[in-house]
A protein has these predicted regions:
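C-terminal amphipathic alpha-helical interaction region
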Residues: 592, 599-797
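Short terminal hydrophobic/aromatic SLiMs and anchors at protein ends
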Residues: 5, 10-16, 34-36, 40-44, ...
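Short, Lys/Arg-enriched N-terminal segments with co-localized hydrophobic residues
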Residues: 72, 79-99
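Active-site-proximal loop/turn and secondary-structure-junction residues that shape catalytic pockets
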Residues: 143-147, 167-169, 197-198, 245, ...
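Targeting/processing segments of secretory and organellar proteins
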Residues: 2-5, 18, 25-28, 33, ...
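Hydrophobic alpha-helix feature that most strongly marks membrane-spanning transmembrane helices
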Residues: 168, 186, 397, 427, ...
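Active-site core of metal-dependent hydrolases
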Residues: 106-219
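Glycine-rich, acidic/polar active-site loops that bind/position phosphate-bearing ligands
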Residues: 220-405, 414-417, 424-661
Length: 797
């Protein structure tokens, strides 16, 4: 029994004594005060009071007058009450004590972070490790052993029994293999052991993960390598060590390795630029990201009745409910109690892991919500987002809910995305995308801004490729998310500055306006220099860019790899030109002006949902428009893309080819699973349900006409006719869909298979859904075989 249970044991005894019928003895007098003293002491001391002291305290209170057996009899008779309630009381005290804890008391308590390293490592080891983290210095074996020992001791103290090299293969989710700390001791017992070698290197099977041809089935050896820049953490009593994953031949088989390479590429080129501006104190440049995560919550008992949600993560059938998101009443609305409880538990779990969960609110669609963290270094933000998605689903299960991360779980309402807030900063704390008070005169900012503009224009196809999945295809361009055409929103102020530079005209800065709301008691504040454009795929938002095309289930690694690499290429070109310039300022102005003229086509400050913009973008401006995943993925191997990515050593050609194949395979497999699920549901659930209802209606008509032969039974016969027609159509369209899947088996090339799915399978899936959804609207509720949209979207109360 823990200290809380002990406390409530004695408090229960005091309460029992207090309940003795009206006896004003010393048992009653002062007992309430004693209870509160015990409780307050427990909270303040965090349950560290000596149990022996509590024993003595209770013994004195209970046995102070041994000549009164009546009181002992009362305790005996009420002992059953104590046994059944004391642990509930203990839990109650523990909950109250937890509420009294501040977040700072437990934030990062499951992370082997800098605070822990400083406390557990000697100064030399700590400094050496930081040299590796900050400057990329080689990790000495002695340092690795010391860190491993400290890490193991800390983890064991926190209840860990195993460790794992935690990595991000090309599946889109994380992977882990657990090994225990135990080693045999000479006396037949065990010792807890963890070496530096085990810390820095692991050997998982590389043939069982997607490799795009880099690994054959018989070529199983792969390696994981510790990423010391991302802190180790404890999850489910397992020490998780963030690692990179690569093959026996050295090819990257994960998403972390290319991400770290892209960050290093951008760092190299940005440092060249900063040196030209005289920033001698800067030692490195890092990109930072804050990903906003959208998701849906549905009741678990309803989720388990839908095969489509279980197999695919989205609904493949479902008629529109009477109410959706038309009233705009869910966005920022009051959070329902059950959801609020989920959010509170989620925050606590994330905070324990050092994840900076900051903002939470209802999103536009019913049952849709959002979680946003404070930004952090890109590779750490990527690790944190993968952890966040995993923990969101685990915490939801504890609350009887299921967290849906699919980009389009429900038709007819908004899907879920993930906004990637991206910026560049120096190790001295300078945000290189911050305009400052006078952006027109801030040449360094303007150069980095132009580098981003040039990068997005030159490699718009790579940005589209980085967010391409079967699920995200449902969102992009559907008037709920940015279009598939990539463009940049800058806002009025920056647009005015660029126009002035392009035309060599003076720039007149607009005066800052104060917001006047017409109510004296409300505060007045300066209006921002630009509005927000929620329809833009890539929007400047004051001191960062918000890349809004990512799907909610996407790893943010892919988008940031391409973005970092593309900007690194722009900075390389600028540095090459400026380093050899005779007149730095003149060359700088000329280069900024040329960038604006050459790449202004990518800038669009209007409504991205407007069809007229899509026509202008493609027909007039010549921007890329790749509506689907098969349209864009093959362009990852375009010559310009291969040249840039290999030149900066972000990918090798073999790695690029493998990723192209893996993305197409994932697309094909995803859609085929969805199509097979539709066939299964149509034949085993929908058709039998409609037939059952039709039979019931037929029986009703027969019964009525037995009693009154003259009855027309127009309602029943009309409905029977409609349902019979729909039954035939569902059966035919199910067969058509199955036939199209069989035809795919004869296609050997993965690109051709993806095209066939895009051109044939998706259309037949949509046709089957249309007739099935119509049948749902005509079938009695008791006959429909699975929960409806209305139940799913409004089931969490």
């Amino acid at each position: 029994m823990n200290a809380f249970a002990h406390a409530w044991y004695y408090i229960s005894i005091l309460r029992i004594c207090q309940c003795v019928q009206g006896q004003k003895t010393f048992f009653v007098q002062g007992v309430d005060k004693s209870i509160f003293l015990v409780y307050d002491a427990l909270v303040k001391a965090k349950a560290s009071l000596s149990i022996k002291l509590l024993d003595a305290f209770a013994f004195f209170i209970f046995l102070a007058d041994p000549k009164k057996p009546f009181h002992r009899m009362a305790v005996f008779r009420l002992s059953f009450f104590f046994l059944t309630h004391s642990f509930r009381f203990a839990s109650s005290v523990k909950r109250r004590a937890n509420l009294m804890r501040t977040v700072s008391d437990y934030f990062g308590c499951l992370v082997f972070d800098d605070r822990v390293m400083k406390a557990r490592l000697n100064a030399d080891i700590y400094q050496s490790l930081h040299k590796t983290i900050d400057q990329g210095a080689k990790l000495d074996a002695g340092v690795a052993n010391a860190v491993a020992a400290a890490m193991k001791d800390w983890a064991v103290e926190h209840g860990a029994t195993h460790y794992t090299h935690w990595f991000q293969p090309l599946t889109g989710i994380t992977a882990e293999k657990h090994d225990s700390f135990i080693s045999p001791a000479p006396d037949g017992g065990i010792i807890m052991d963890f070496s530096g070698k085990e810390l820095i290197k692991g050997e998982p099977d590389a043939s069982s993960f997607p490799s795009g041809g880099l690994r054959a089935t018989f070529e199983a050896r792969g390696y994981t390598a510790w990423d010391p820049t991302s802190y180790a953490f404890i999850k489910d009593r397992t020490l998780c060590i963030p690692t990179a994953f690569y093959s026996y031949g050295g090819e990257a088989l994960d998403k972390k390795t290319p991400l770290l390479r892209s960050m290093e590429a951008l760092n190299r080129q940005a440092m060249r630029i900063l040196k030209l501006f005289g920033n001698e104190d800067v030692k490195c440049v890092r990109t930072s990201v804050g990903p906003e995560q959208e998701y849906f919550l549905v009741p678990k008992e309803l989720y388990e009745k839908r095969k489509d949600l279980i197999y695919t993560g989205r609904t493949l059938f479902g008629a529109k409910p009477p109410k959706g998101q038309e009233m705009d009443d869910h966005y920022f609305g009051v959070v329902k109690p059950r959801v609020a409880a989920y959010m509170a538990d989620l925050n606590e779990e994330l905070w324990k892991l050092g994840i900076l969960a900051k903002t939470e609110h209802n999103e536009v669609a019913p049952a849709q919500h959002e979680l946003a963290p404070i930004y952090t270094t890109t590779n750490i933000a990527t690790d944190h987002n993968q952890l966040t998605m995993e923990i969101m689903q685990k915490v939801a299960a504890k609350h009887g809910l299921v967290c849906l991360l699919h980009e389009k779980p429900f038709a007819g309402v908004n899907g879920s995305g993930k906004h990637n807030n991206w910026s560049i900063a120096t190790d001295t704390g300078v945000n290189l995308l911050s305009p400052g008070e006078t952006p027109y005169e801030n040449a360094q900012f303007l150069l980095f801004l132009c580098a981003v503009i040039k990068a997005v224009d030159d490699y718009q196809d790579l940005l589209r490729i980085s967010v391409a999945t079967a699920g995200n295809d449902h969102r992009l361009g559907a008037n709920e998310a940015p279009p598939a055409v990539v463009s940049i929103f800058l806002g009025d102020e920056l647009q005015g500055i660029l126009d002035a530079i392009e035309n060599d005209t003076p720039y007149e800065a607009a005066k800052k306006k104060t917001m006047k709301l017409g109510v004296d008691v409300l505060p007045r504040f300066a209006r921002d220099t630009t509005d927000r454009n929620r329809t833009s795929p890539f929007a400047f938002t004051g001191n960062k860019f918000e890349f809004r095309m990512l799907g909610s289930s996407n790893s943010i690694a892919c988008a940031n790899i391409m973005l970092n690499a593309a900007v690194a290429e722009s900075l390389r070109i600028y540095a090459d030109r400026l380093e050899g310039a005779e007149d730095f300022e003149e060359k700088l102005h000329e280069m900024i002006q040329k960038t604006i003229k050459d790449h202004k086509r990518i800038i669009f400050n209007g409504n991205g949902y407007d069809e007229a913009w899509i026509r202008e973008a493609t027909e007039v401006r010549g921007l890329c428009n790749y509506p689907t995943t098969p349209d864009c993925i093959p362009h990852s191997l375009d010559e310009k893309n291969v040249q840039m990515l290999t030149a900066h050593k972000v990918f090798t050609l073999a790695e690029l080819k493998s990723r192209c194949e893996i993305q197409l395979e994932n697309y094909c497999k995803t859609v085929v699973i969805e199509a097979n699920t539709m066939i299964d549901m149509a034949r085993k659930q929908i058709l039998p349900a409609v037939e059952s209802y039709t039979a019931e209606l037929s029986g009703t008509v027969a019964a009525k006409r037995t009693v009154a032969p003259e009855l027309a039974c127009l309602y029943e016969t009309g409905l029977i006719y409609k349902l019979s027609r729909l039954t035939d159509q569902i059966a035919v369209k199910t067969d058509d869909l199955e036939e199209s899947l069989l035809e795919l088996k004869s296609v050997s090339d993965i690109t051709e298979e993806a095209y066939a799915i895009r051109d044939a399978v998706l259309g037949k899936m949509a046709a089957l859904r249309t007739v099935a959804d119509e049948a749902e609207t005509l079938t009695a509720e008791k006959h429909w075989p699975f929960p409806t949209y209305g139940e799913l979207l409004f089931g969490v109360r």
